[in-house]
Every structure is written in structure tokens, then in C-alpha cells.
């Protein structure tokens, strides 16, 4: 039996991981966020109510589940408290079953101001960050100057270290970026009241997870963003600041690779991307309008319109290999309903050399042309279908072709936004390794 399951995105984020996590954690004991921050946006629809989570693990909507925000996550205490209070309006109370790693770096106002100042100075060369301070917070971690969640437990030390780091940031903000400075006293004043609200949640989460594994508890590891936003394996520099591929699970939790039983890659039935960066299958036609309208392709974190395109199987296959995926979950299959034909990108061609490229360098992307296979679409609605056999023949053929190209099984298919709109082809908890 598979106890410990990783769920991660195979594209550029927004694949629908939150819903999949929500569906699988009803039978689990723990759900763990291991990287990213509140730049993630996991949208769940429960009883026709939309709930968007940016920081708290999606599986906490189930009242029997314990949530972990592990050491790989950068945490804004203000955003965390805001989410906790939002969940309480839905009668979901998490104070006694949510734990935060004492090693998680803090996101504070100076990170946000630095993020905004940099994007403004870059102008048309901006990376398109969410402006929430994620990158600067990870920089502090790597530079070994970060304030961490555990520092909140010692007010005197916190005050001294905070003043030093505010001075460091203000020197850059004012002198180089010509940006307004931040006020150390205001940051400290606003931060102190948050301590009492989350004090009891601050734990050594690595030890909690080790104990859970030794006790044979089921654990879901919930990824944020997608594989091609990974700082090392993504379309650099148009990436996030953390490891959103499988390596982020290990470093971001302290759980060893041998403890991971099954790795599920979540992919849309087509492709989307928010912000700048390479996107070889991008569309600018009526199909783009179809995807945007029917798929509601607007970012849950930024509200920006997502770029849309056909499924990129070259990128998907690379993601399969990078993450050692056990199986796939195809989401938003219903968005393809009504299309006359459907395409899959199976190779990249350099338009100058006509050479087939496995995965381009950053300067090569502009010369890449996708090579497509074309398949017939379907007119029957797939929305809400719960059995594989009930899908139209053409839809099943499309799924089969994805399995052939990637050489791994499609174990789950999402056919709509509600948590009940799902096909479990195989029970991933009981698939033999």
C-alpha cells in the first residue's frame, strides 16, 4: 500500500493540484506544503462554494487531516492569519491541526517592497513576479540572513535582528532603486500581535513527519507552482525561487526519498502559463478564446489572464523524467469539449536550422516551432463524468495517446471544477511499486 504520495505540477502551475489534493486527503492523515509561499493559488469548489488557498494546505478542508507548512515554505504571518480567518467563515477551524516549521523563512514588508522596486526598475524586462516578496525572502534564506518563524518566539532577539535587516534593505531601496524606505518600528509593531495567534503552531515539523511515517500514517505532499517554474529545471530566468520539482519535497520537509511511495504529476489537458517566459504552443486564435472562457483561465493569485496553448508533450515528458513520476492526473478534460480537432506538441523544431531540439537554451526559445499531432475532437459533454468508459471514444483516445507518449499511466482524470467531478482510473494508494 502506498502511504506517502507526492502531488506536483508538470507544467507552469495552475494545473489543478488543489482539487486533486483535496480529493486524495479525505483518506489521509497529513497534508504537507513543502515549497513556495502565498504566490501559489489553489482553487477548490466544495458544494458550489469556491475557496482559494495560497498558503494553507488544500487538504485541511477535511476535518480529520493535520496540515503541515514545512521548512521549504516562505511564510507571511499576516497572509497566514488572513487565510485562517477566511476558513473560519466557512466553519473550517485549523488552529489545533495546523503546524508551521520553526525553520520556515518569514516574508515581511521589506521583501514585498524590494520585489516591487525591482520589477519597476526592470520595466519591459521584468520577470512578472506576483509582487509578494517570495524571491527576496528566498534570497535571505540562501544568504543566511533570513528571519525564520522560530525567531518569533524570542521578542528581544527578533527586534535586534529585524532592525539590522531593515537597515540592509533600506540602503538598497533608497540608494539604488529610489524607492521609499520601510519603517522598522512599524514592521515590529505589526508583527508582534501575530505571534500569540500562531505561537502554538510553531513546531519541529520534520520530527512530526518522521513520527507519522514510522506510525504508517498516510501523508500527501502538496506541491505549488509547476515543474517549469522550478529555479533549476524551469524556463530560467522566468521561474519561481524554489524547487517545485521532486527535489523540493526532500529538502523542503526533511523526509528522505525512500519514504516517498508514489509521485503523481498533474497536467491540464492543454497548456497555460501566467506572465512572461517561453511558451512554444501558445495560441492567439479562437481556440485561445475557447480555453480562456471555458477554462476560466485567470490567475487565482494575480487575476491575470493566463496564456493558453495546446498540450506540450515535449515539456510533459521532460517533467516525467525529472520527477520520476509514477502516474499522471489529467485535469480540465471537459474544457476540450466542443473542439473540432485537438493537437499535441510532440517535438520542437528550430526554424533556422530545422534541427529537432530536445529542450532549448533560453536564447533558443524564440526560434522554436512546435511540431503537432492532430486528433479529432468530440461534441459530447465530459463535464461531471465519473467513469472512464463513459467518456467519448475520442476523449479516451486522447488519454491513451498521452500515456503512449509519456510512457506512464493516467491514473486520475478531472472532468469539472467540483471535487466530485473526477475519474479514478486506478486507486493510487494500492498501486504496487
Swiss-Prot record:
Pathway as given in its UniProt record: Purine metabolism; AMP biosynthesis via de novo pathway; AMP from IMP: step 1/2
Pfam families reported for this sequence: Adenylsucc_synt
GO biological process: 'de novo' AMP biosynthetic process; IMP metabolic process
Record's subcellular location: Cytoplasm
Keywords: Cytoplasm, GTP-binding, Ligase, Magnesium, Metal-binding, Nucleotide-binding, Purine biosynthesis
Cofactor(s) the protein needs: Mg(2+)
Catalytic activity: IMP + L-aspartate + GTP = N(6)-(1,2-dicarboxyethyl)-AMP + GDP + phosphate + 2 H(+)
Binding site for Mg(2+): 14, 41
Binding site for substrate: 300-306
Gene Ontology CC terms, in alphabetical order: cytoplasm
List of residues binding IMP: 14-17, 39-42, 130, 144, 225, 240, 304
Alphabetized InterPro entries for the sequence: Adenylosuccin_syn_GTP-bd (IPR018220), Adenylosuccin_syn_Lys_AS (IPR033128), Adenylosuccinate_synth_dom1 (IPR042109), Adenylosuccinate_synth_dom2 (IPR042110), Adenylosuccinate_synth_dom3 (IPR042111), Adenylosuccinate_synthetase (IPR001114), P-loop_NTPase (IPR027417)
Keyword match Magnesium: yes
Record's cofactor remark: Binds 1 Mg(2+) ion per subunit.
Chain positions recorded as GTP binding sites: 13-19, 41-43, 306, 332-334, 414-416
Listed GO MF terms: adenylosuccinate synthase activity; GTP binding; magnesium ion binding
Catalytic residues identified in the record: 14 (proton acceptor), 42 (proton donor)
Keyword Acetylation annotated: no
EC code: 6.3.4.4
PANTHER family, sorted: ADENYLOSUCCINATE SYNTHETASE (PTHR11846:SF0)
NCBIfam families referenced in this protein's UniProt entry, alphabetically: PRK01117.1, purA
Family: Belongs to the adenylosuccinate synthetase family.
Summary of the function given for this chain in its UniProt record: Plays an important role in the de novo pathway of purine nucleotide biosynthesis. Catalyzes the first committed step in the biosynthesis of AMP from IMP.
Assembly information from the UniProt record: Homodimer.
Listed name of the protein: Adenylosuccinate synthetase
